[in-house]
Structures are given as structure tokens and as C-alpha cells.
């Protein structure tokens, strides 16, 4: 058995997270029409699949979850369908009888969402009613009947009806009817990338092929945050991979309850408002979502068991983009050796990611700390963490190092994305392609030194990658001064904000999180911790979510605060203003472990109705409420 066959046999042949019989069909085209009702807080719709049968099957099985299905038609004729009982987390299979002989067919289904829909959230926006969807990983089935697996990709035509402006996962098309919006997506996409948003949306340009959308009050801030870098990001990404194929790269800044940092919706990337920090320190999230235009959207993991193929590649490309931007800016500033500086910036970002990986491995379910997961009976949302992002990045960085660096790895990047574009693949196909590419170049022996078993299937951390620490060392020097001070037992504090004056955004984050990590092994007095806001007032006053979350972790973890202290009250109230799970889930865990479980639950109960259904469910699990 070859190593590729062995890797292939170690994961499921078919996606275990879908009830559909997707392997028996090719989806030629999908037409999806959605109608928004703000009064009823639901979305009704119609989906038409143009299918080609790959077997003699006499039934079509689609995924649904908490959907009302009213009619089903096959080749224009109404048929009797069966909606099987709901079983969490995979929903209710929709079984539609079809002719076993005809190779080509169209299937049409009418449906409506219910109040149990996990994909959509109706809220009151800043200027009026608002609805948005979030279908990753397996929530598209609660929006419309579908093959809810990344293993199926289809071109789409979308129609949306709403009294408010709509965006969907495609390029806007002309409409002659008020309240009706048309979109075309000629590039095949999977169900989790289907999206609808409707609200009082306005747009502003942030580049020659990019607009940003948001509600009016925040539009100018959104425009300022992204306009400096957007087109540069696209052009650099095109040099690393190849030409951007999606025509336009527009983005939408969503309300605060959006549960992720960003979501790579084709032609309309969704972004959390926590990115609007008014200092451009978080634009790397935009670089990440842009990178998804190749990794994830053009080339897709075939199931959520191979999620690292989406996210590991995306983080890798994101850091290449960020490094190249830094090098270009260094050259403009007349710095010596700008290319070297750009590489130092890339490595510095990798160090931040490595720290997140270490923290995740220490606190997460071990079975989900491998790159390839077994999701036969599990909800992919339960497996979601920094693992596929950061361990995936480190795997690709390890390969890059083994084959001789970026100059040797860059041709493979272009080859890989050209070979698999418009397709979905698994980890075995990736490894096989890697060997096919490098063996003729005399690098098979180098690849053979990579422990594929350990990287792909074993839980835990990989070996320390030994990143360039040049930019991190400035931070570590200050941290060591703090460690020495605590160990000395001195009481006169000699630190001030001047210590961090020269730090840039990412360095500040590294400083706070490294201090938090080092303090766990020291006897740090709560009195000293409570002095920190007066020593570093810029952190105490920061509106940047990355700084704010880390700063409050440092204070609450070691400050011996109670639920009646203003610091804890402030942080608890902040958790009610953000919906991004990156902040919300660790935030409640912090309250649980460092204040009290009762206070954590009480705070969650106060804000739970503000959170997106995905976020609400995950916090309930974290606090043992579900």
C-alpha cells in the first residue's frame, strides 16, 4: 500500500456530515430564490437543481434542518416527498423520488425557514431591520434544501426579494423591479458559501475593484480602515498564486453579533465590526479573507475532516501577503534589506499564531488537535478552533522549509491551485500532488523526511518551527524585565508607558499574551496586577478587540477580582457588545475560571439573545448549559 493510499484510508471516502446522496449526482447548475420577511422573521424560497445522475438511483436525498418544505417537483411534475425525522446535528433528510432511467433532470423545491434556523439571524441594525446568514459549516441546510457538503460545488444564479438592500454570493446583475435583486456566480461554489444579507446598506470604494458595504453610520470608518491596503493585497496575492478570478472583491461589515472575524463569501466577504479599530492593525483579516479566494473558494476541502486544506493554506497565503506588504513599505521608507524585513514580519505573525496554537492544544479536546479529523458522529462546529489554521500553516511552512524555501515552494503554489481549481480534494490528494511535483525535481528524499503520520493524524503540537524572532525579541526583553522584577520582590514599580512606545500593533499583543503566560509560573501579587492600568493606560483605554481581550485576560486571571469589581463588570459588559466567537468563548471561560461559574452564566443569560445561534450554542456547551 502506498503512503497516499494509506492516508486516504485513514479518513472517510464520503463526507460523514451530510445526509445527502451527493456522490450519485453531478450538480450542473443551481437557481436559488429567497424572499425576506422582516415581519415574520423568516426567509421563504425556491431552489432548482439541474442534475446529471452518476448512478441508476431512483431517489434524491437533500440535507435540510428545521425547514418547512411545501412542494417538490421533478422535471416540472409535482412528486410526493418524505421529510425524515430530525437528528442532531445533521438535520432531516429530504427524500425525493426520481426516475431511475433518465440521466439528466431538474428538481425544484419550495421551502421556508423556521425560528429554529441556525443559519440566519434577524436583528435590529443601527438604522433599521437587518438579517444576515452564516452557513459554515453545516448550516446551509437550515436555509435551503441542499447537498450540504464542501464536496459538491455548483455555479449559481441568485434572486433575492426584500424591502431593504440585499447582497448574496455573486456578482450583482441589473434588475427592473423594485425590491428584487439578481446575482450571478459562474464559478462553482459549495453550499457553505451561499449567503444572503439584507438591511439599510450603503457602499463606498476601497479600491478599483473593491467596495465596502455597511450601514451608514460606520461607512466612513470602514472605508478608511481598508482603502490603504485593499488593492495592494489583491495584486500581491495575484503574484503569489495567479490572477484573481472573481471579478470584484467587495466586502460587507456586519453587525456586532456576527460570530466570526470574517467569512469568505465570494464577491462579498463578510467582516466583523471588531476590525474597525481605527488604527489599521487588523487588516490582516482582510488579507486572510482575500486569500480564501484561492484557498477554500477556488480549491476546497472535500469534507470538514480536511478543513486544514482550506484554512492552513489561507493562513499561509495571508502571511505571505502581509510579509510582502511590509517589504514594499520598508523599501518606500528606505530601510536596508526590505526583503529581509518582510520575512521577519511574516515570521513574527507566525510566532503570534504559534502561541495561539500552543494555547489551543493545551485547552482543546485532543481528538480535534490533529490536522485530519474523524467527524463520523460529531458536529464540525465542535471541532472548530485555531488548529486547522495554525497547525495547517505550520505544516505548509515545514514543507516550504524542506523543499528549500519560498523560491522552491512558490512554483508548487501555482501548480496546486491550477490543478485543483473548481474542485474539492482530500489530504491524500494534496500529498500525492506534492510528490508528483517535487519527485522529478530531485526532492523526494527531502519530502520523505516529513513525518506525515505525525503531522496529519496525531494530536498535539508539532516540533517547534524555530521562527525568526528578531521582531519578537524586543518584546521578550521587556517581558524578562517584568519577570525579574516580580522575582526580586521589589515594591517600587519602575515601568511606564514609555516601555511600549515603539511597539507596533502585533508587538503589543505579543507583549500582553507573553506576560500572561510567564506570570502563571510566578507568585504575582494581585496588588501589582491592579496597578497595570495606571502603568500602561493605553492598553486600559484600547478599543482594539485584540488588545482588549488579551489585556482583560491578564488582569482578571491574576488580579483576584470579584464580580463586584469594575474591571470585571467592564469586561462582562463588553462581552455583550461583541459576537465574535474568538472573543466571546474565551471570555466566558475566563469569567468561569477566574471569577465564578455563577457570574459567567448570569452574564451569558443577560446577553444570549444578542448572539448568533452558532455562538449561543457553543457558549452553552462551554458553560455546560447544553
UniProtKB/Swiss-Prot annotation:
Compartments, as annotated in UniProt: Cytoplasm; Nucleus
Domain of life: Eukaryota
Cofactor binding annotation: Binds 1 zinc ion per subunit.
Required co-factors: Zn(2+)
GO cellular component terms given for this protein: cytosol; nucleus
Protein purpose: Aminopeptidase that preferentially cleaves di- and tripeptides. Also has low epoxide hydrolase activity (in vitro). Can hydrolyze the epoxide leukotriene LTA(4) but it forms preferentially 5,6-dihydroxy-7,9,11,14-eicosatetraenoic acid rather than the cytokine leukotriene B(4) as the product compared to the homologous mammalian enzyme (in vitro).
Protein name in the entry: Leucine aminopeptidase 2-1
Species annotation: Scheffersomyces stipitis (strain ATCC 58785 / CBS 6054 / NBRC 10063 / NRRL Y-11545) (Yeast)
Gene (name only): LKA4
